[in-house]
Amino acid sequence: MEPQKIKGITARENLYLLSAQIDFIFKDMNVINNCFLAQLVPTLIVGNRLFSSYTIHTDFETLTCSLTAIQFIDAYGLLGCSVEKLPLLVAILYYPEKYTSEGAHMLSQTFVDVDPVILQAITLNFQAFSNYLFTRTRFNILYLKKSKDHKPSISIGMAESLYNLSADGLGDVDVIEQMPVIKYLTILRKKLIESVTAMNEVGLDLVEISDKTGLSIKMIKMIL
């Protein structure tokens, strides 16, 4: 990071908030806490416009998030992208109206000149939220682990499931897309558990179920 590129009070405040999540004092300089539930960059000012990001709430031991299913899927699919695509990721996360993928692409030009440090901070925040969802909550069974240098294919599976749920009668595609992401993941989790149970009941062994679902045998045993 180059300190001279950090300009403006808002940029410094956001960086300070994110620094609380970075473990660097007397420890490995490269170790970052990228697994937490918090919205550390709730607003972003670009020119004369104020953009509000998604919200995360954990009151009463209940997790909610304002992101819609399609909004989360689009943003998750961009994690690990090149710096040039970060304005699109930010446009998705800070979209001001009813979300559409097309609208986010149009809005992305608004964020092209935003300080790269801020764009990366927003990306880190969303990455940490996603990591928490798929490693520290009941949604961990949706996280398909591959080799360490292979990005999990969950975003592809989630996108396909939009149409599967619509075909199952849960509503048209637009209704499913606008569903709150936590509700959407809850349905996917339920469907996956039902599939594992059904495969077990027809006599498939654990290895076969693992091959078909991508779940570890340990996870399958926990479900059954």
Identify the role of each PLM range:
Residues 1-202, 207-224:
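An amphipathic, hydrophobic-aromatic interaction surface with interspersed Lys/Arg
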